[in-house]
Every structure is written in structure tokens, then in C-alpha cells.
């Protein structure tokens, strides 16, 4: 399930250059209390990994950069997706009832629309509307750990994306069938950008990708997100035009 959120502020919007944590905070503030507490404190388990099973996009409108802030006109739009309909149903209802504030921006009106992706094919072309983050933790010779962010040309990139998706499947449905196939490859040029989520620096990829495999995994990829840090606003993919 995917919902589109359109927020309107009479004076326009001013948000930080790295605004992902602001959007995440807005969503958590509008989740119904029980759902928000569950997602924040527990989530969905796969071994030692925990998944929130929602993802959100970048803001879709163009902005003017002024110092360390972005200035938007009176309306901003972003998308939120989840394979668990209950997560988004309560969210949309609460935002319509009480749009509230986005940071210091008073929201005068909110519009919510929804769609359920119909995906039965075994391959689909997608475009990232928030950056795809793929990383692994390595250890240096002195024993210190560091984060290695992978680009689509790295040979381990497809494997890490697939393994992450299989763990997400397991956290939702239990056992993972042995015949679940999945592959990902870039379609044309892509762009790697760095940005912060709070004090954490992340690198992610924008571009188009071809996903192939079991429709159950392809559907999950489009609703829960690809790669890591989905609940922080990374890895949302939609059908490519």
C-alpha cells in the first residue's frame, strides 16, 4: 500500500537541508499511539534484525537552497509505503484529522490519497524516489570498524540487496521459501549522493533499476523499500515511467 501526502502551508515551507529526520518525526507523531509504540520499540523481527516495514520518499517539489535550509512553496508532496496496510491506514486518518506542524511550519491543510501496487510480473523497471543505501561493516587492521557503502557496480551489491529483502520477508511471513529468486541491476547511469540522517552520514544511489524474480519479493521491494534505512527515508522505489 502506498499513500501520497500533500501538505499545504500558507507561508510556504522551510526545512533543513538534511530533512529526513524531520519527515520521520512527523510520521511517528501521526501514527496511532499503539502502532507508533510498536514500530519504535519492537518492529518486525528476523533473527537479530528488526524492520519497521515502512519507507518514505524525498520531497518531490523543487526547492531553493538558502544556506543550510531548503525553501519550498506552499505545497510539498511525499510518498509513504508499507506492506502492512494497518500502518498507513491509521497514519492517513490522523494526518487528515490534525495535520499539525512540520518542524516550525504550520500546516493549514493535508490531502491523502492511496493506491495498492498491482504487481504480478516477474520483472519491473523502477526508479528510486529516495536513495538506495547498501552497506556493510568492515574491520580495519587496527580493529576499528567502518562502514563501506556500495554502489551498483560493486559485485556484492545485488547479493546484499537480495539478502536484506529475504530477511524482510522472513520478518513478515516466517519461513522463507527456498525458490524465491531476486536480482537487481542498474538501467543506465546512476548518481550517488551523501546526506545526513541526524548525525549519521549515509551514501545512497538514485537512478533506474531492473528488478527480476519472484513477484512476492518484487511486491515487497516496492512496499517496504530496497536496501537499508527504509524507515529513515531511504530506498523507496516506484514503477519507472
Describe the predicted segments one by one.
Residues 1-241:
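RNA-interacting cores
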Amino acid at each position: 500500500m502506498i499513500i501520497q501526502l500533500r501538505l499545504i502551508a500558507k507561508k510556504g515551507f522551510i526545512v533543513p537541508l538534511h530533512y529526513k529526520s524531520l519527515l520521520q518525526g512527523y510520521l511517528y507523531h501521526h501514527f496511532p499511539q499503539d502502532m507508533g509504540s510498536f514500530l519504535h520499540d519492537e518492529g518486525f523481527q528476523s533473527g537479530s534484525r528488526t524492520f519497521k516495514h515502512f519507507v518514505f520518499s524525498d520531497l518531490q517539489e523543487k526547492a531553493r537552497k538558502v544556506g543550510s535550509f531548503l525553501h519550498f512553496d506552499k505545497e510539498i508532496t511525499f510518498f509513504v509505503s508499507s506492506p502492512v496496510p494497518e500502518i498507513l491506514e491509521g497514519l492517513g486518518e490522523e494526518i487528515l484529522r490534525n495535520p499539525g506542524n512540520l518542524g516550525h511550519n504550520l500546516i493549514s491543510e493535508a490531502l491523502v490519497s492511496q493506491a495498492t501496487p498491482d504487481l504480478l510480473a516477474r520483472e519491473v523497471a523502477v526508479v528510486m524516489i529516495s536513495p538506495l543505501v547498501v552497506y556493510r561493516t568492515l574491520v580495519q587492521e587496527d580493529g576499528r570498524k567502518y562502514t563501506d557503502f556500495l554502489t551498483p557496480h560493486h559485485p556484492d551489491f545485488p547479493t546484499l540487496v537480495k539478502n536484506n529483502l529475504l530477511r524482510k520477508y522472513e520478518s513478515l511471513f516466517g519461513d522463507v521459501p527456498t525458490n524465491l529468486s531476486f536480482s537487481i541491476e542498474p538501467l543506465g547511469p546512476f548518481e550517488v549522493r551523501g546526506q545526513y540522517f541526524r548525525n549519521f552520514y549515509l551514501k545512497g544511489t538514485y537512478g533506474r533499476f531492473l528488478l527480476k524474480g519472484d513477484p512476492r519479493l518484487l511486491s515487497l521491494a516496492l512496499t517496504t523499500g530496497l536496501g537499508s534505512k527504509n524507515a529513515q527515508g531511504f530506498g523507496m522505489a516506484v514503477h519507472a515511467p
